[in-house]
């Protein structure tokens, strides 16, 4: 067993760029915190792994090619591998717990990331 503590304390502050902090990585899973200040632009590329986002704090929306959904504390969103997605309309500093399966980078990239 490994207990992770403090993941909810990581967060980008106003004026800082979005950032990623990895907390755990094993072959089949990785977990980290992705933080985006209010008004920032999310420039991430699609990943080769399935993702689950759990919003810890803040408000915004997650947009894919097919839909846009408002998210806030407690929102849980599944994004399948390869799907284009970005956080948009970030109106409050946003911190999300991100789970990748398998671990981020475990699959070969097909998008030139």
Task: Show which residues each predicted segment covers.
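Short hydrophobic/aromatic-rich beta-strand segments that constitute the beta-sheet cores
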Residues: 33, 62-64, 96
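Ligand-binding loop in jelly-roll beta-barrel domains
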Residues: 81-106
